A protein has these predicted regions:
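Gly/Ser/Thr-rich loops at beta-strand to alpha-helix junctions
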Residues: 97-101, 172-173
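Catalytic-site beta-strand/loop segments enriched in glycine and acidic/polar residues
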Residues: 91, 157-190
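Short, flexible loop segments at the rims of nucleotide/cofactor-binding pockets, characterized by
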Residues: 53, 68-73, 97, 140-145, ...
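Conserved nucleotide-cofactor-binding alpha/beta core module
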Residues: 112, 119-159
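A structural signal for short, well-ordered beta-strand segments and their strand-loop junctions
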Residues: 119-122, 165-167, 200-204
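"Short basic amphipathic alpha-helical interaction patches in structured regions
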Residues: 105-111, 152, 180
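A cross-family acyltransferase "interaction/gating" segment
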Residues: 177-210
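Membrane-anchoring hydrophobic helices of lipid-metabolizing enzymes
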Residues: 2-94, 104-106, 113-115, 133-134
Length: 210
């Protein structure tokens, strides 16, 4: 039986699966138990929860700083590029997504240094992290569905003259014969930009995992 409750500072893989694929638990325990064990290791459930407990109470940009520091993750931006980031007014930042969650957090932190009214469109599973809730506009990437309320939340931020970060590929870049590249970008961000009359700020994220 999967766990239904979650404290403010821990994640539970069972609950994450239950929210996305409840039919998984209709299968035989001989299938679900070893699968859950593997998924917990893949998600580093124990290590993540140790980090969350250690940093309980940290939210927003402070939480991001703790995450980046934990992974010894740094980024560099030229002064010219930094000056291209408007300090106010509605704006959509569109970027490639080569490194997974860390590049999204780093981009959030960068924009937040210039203007704190920034949010990122990201997988709704991140809402399980209390430290990120105030900065995330959740969408269902795994289910391939973006609901009307989710789109409305994105557009409301732009109408409120805030900045919104979007990864149009909707997923992390993949290896291809010509290198690591995003999948085809979804054009929905153009429709949002047109409807809200929002300028676009393209960002290219380069880097590597070490």
């Amino acid at each position: 039986k999967y766990l239904l409750e979650r404290s403010n500072t821990v994640i539970q893989v069972e609950q994450m699966i239950a929210s996305k694929s409840p039919q998984f638990f209709d299968k035989s325990p001989f299938i679900t138990r070893p699968t859950l064990s593997v998924l917990k290791r893949l998600f580093h459930e124990s290590e993540v929860n140790q980090f969350l407990e250690k940093n309980d109470g940290c939210v927003g940009f402070e939480f991001i700083d703790r995450v980046l520091d934990h992974f010894n993750f740094s980024y560099q931006v030229s002064q010219v590029d930094r000056r291209n980031i408007p300090a106010s007014g509605r704006m959509m930042i569109i970027a490639n997504h080569p490194l997974g969650a860390l590049d999204g957090l780093a981009l959030l932190r960068l924009i937040g240094e210039i203007r704190p009214d920034v949010k990122i469109v990201a997988n709704d599973l991140l809402m399980g992290f209390d430290g990120l809730k105030s900065l995330v506009l959740p969408v269902d990437n795994l289910g391939g569905k973006t609901g009307r309320q989710q789109l409305k939340a994105i557009m409301n931020c732009l109408h409120n003259e805030e900045a919104v970060i979007i990864f149009p590929a909707g997923e992390v870049s993949r290896m291809s014969p010509s290198g690591i590249k995003d999948q085809q970008w979804n054009q929905y961000y153009l429709k949002i930009a047109q409807k809200t009359n929002s300028p676009l700020l393209p960002v290219h994220i380069g880097g590597r995992n070490s």
